[in-house]
Amino acid sequence: FTDWNQSVVNEKVYTVALVGIAVISWLMIRWSDDPDGPKADRILVLVAYLSSLGYGVHMAGMLAAPAVAVAVLVRRPRTLLRWRLLLAIAGALVLGLTPFATQPIRAAYNPPIDEGEPTACRNGLHLSCTFSSGTYDAFMYNFNRGQYGKPALDQRQAPFTGQIGMWWYYFKWQWMRDPFNQNPAMQSILAAVFFVLGAFGAWVHFQRERRSFWYFGTYMFTTTLLLIYYLNFKYGATQPVTGDVAREVRDRDYFFLWSFSAWGVWAALGLVFIWESVASFFGTERTKLGKDLITLPTDQALKFGSPILLIAIIPLFTNWQWAPRSGQTDTRDFAHDLLDSVEPYGVLVTVGDNDTFPLWYAQEVEGIRRDVIDANTSLLNTDWYGRQLLRRPVYDYDEAKGPAVYRGKQWEKPKGPPLNMSLSDIDAIPEAEQLPNRMAFDAGGLHAILDPDSLEEGYLQRADILVLRMIKDAWPARPVYFSRTSGDYPSRTLGLAKYLIEQGLASKVIMPPAKPTPDTVWMPPNPFRGEGEWMDVQRSKELWLHDFTAPASLIRRGSWIDEPSKGIPYLYVITGGDLIGALRTVHDTADAQHAFATMMGVAHMIRMDGPGVIPPLNSGFWEQGMLAGPPPAVAATRGDSAHGPKSSDTRAGVVLHDTGPKKRPPARPGR
């Protein structure tokens, strides 16, 4: 059982890899029964092929390899001395890895989604660049997962005991998922029962079928203690740990499904052992097994003892409520809503997986709002994503399929990408640039202050430079938006606080209005919203009430059990609250009531509607401090007159103006 159920990766990757391991395990048990049989060598060659083929699906495809080696060493070590068999196994391993060869070939054709870009070819597939050191280096970087930068194994990200505790925490989920901690005692009891059953099963396996135990026992060791040590995870995202500790961004329970599934086999053996033991009280008989006579329960006795087998179906009932996903369209609907929050041909800046991968699916599979460019800041920090933005074609906006609020207007199709740069210009952008002091960024009348104290150790990241460059090159002719999932990134990191207006689930870069309008409301900071900003009341109302589809699907879903991804439904609570306050400020009470009911439905789904959590509609909280017009102007100083005019600094085509000396911390070591 896993609750990472907003991702089809579970079915398309982990489950497929698990099927491969299951087939390998079945083959090795057959081989262990008859290692000198006529098909024994063929089985080993097939196992080698399936292992490397499974590696192409997921690295876990090789998890059975140590167990295969131990089984061969224990059962028939002389097998390792037969060079023809070893050559056949080596050939099978290479053959199974050949699907990897498609990666640089595919990448050379610049597909819409090409993570890692494992090729040195920049203008199509050619032999000279495909068979080059550049392609080899790019491919091996992907193959070895270099982008993740895991520390050395002797640098533990959490104590090994804590990492084992993470395994146990997720082990308990398999027998009874208790997402809201309502029955912790029962969950622990069931986990203990199935743990003991598995331990009994391991003992029974060792006693009765030692030939296959060497394979299965080694596999279990590999997928538990050895894998836990190798993965070297931080504490789990929701693992109960006291104190402020480093945690994974999501619960990594799916990395241990290999051991959980295998433990289920041992638990089944243990349950059968208990069934036979109980049945023996109702009658036994002597049965010949090979040359030996053994005592077994009679058929009638087994029937009397069979109710004990009902233990096996307990997890089916305890997890049924949380496991099915039929009718869950909220992830797709969220992508639809976020894309529709952006005007035609807009650039949407996102920050992570949850606000990017659903958008890719919606655009590339369902063809939803392909005119919008999704610029992910995490990926913009890589050396390849910027090139993909340059190559991405400008897709036509389909007015008939777009929101009604955009119809009847002329939307000029851009002639090129949002970056006025060449591929070599993109490649020349540094990984990071240190700001010596406060700098001003100017573009199309916009004047933003970049403060080193608001940057990571005073450095402007590659992604920050590219986002500023997109504003400089494309805005205001092309709309630029920041997803509301980006938090205070545009306001704090890029200094754009007063240049943002909320429209649906995104904030658009604008020139702040000079006078009040009926549709423009200033929203001050509050505990739900965080930073203050403008709201386009009419646009947000039309999107919320007539276009958004996720609130209804979230309410229909009924509950949200994955705590780390709760930010998606929570986003609807935040933006709903903003809209409610704005509508009440402009005295649109009927629509405010409608929006409040929808927001409370989503809040109930994530259990955020308890007493005192969300203020009542008529409490005055939502419209508190809102102004139907601009807030007091805040002067943005362009220079310190006491020091005279300041110099300009050009960084990757982004002109920054020095606003005055400011003491900085010493430069950090090379990145």
Please tell me what each predicted stretch does.
Residues 26:
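Short, small/polar-rich loop/turn modules that mediate ligand/substrate recognition or access, typified
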Residues 1-7:
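Short intrinsically disordered, low-complexity coil segments enriched in acidic
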Residues 8-18, 30-47, 51-252, 256-345, ...:
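ER/secretory pathway lumenal C-terminal domains and tails of membrane proteins involved
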Residues 353:
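Acidic-and-aromatic substrate-binding clefts and catalytic sites of carbohydrate-active enzymes
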Residues 3, 20-23, 226:
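Transmembrane-helix signature of multi-pass solute transporters
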Residues 659-671:
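Short Lys/Arg-rich cationic patches that frequently serve as NLS/NoLS or arginine-rich RNA/DNA-binding motifs
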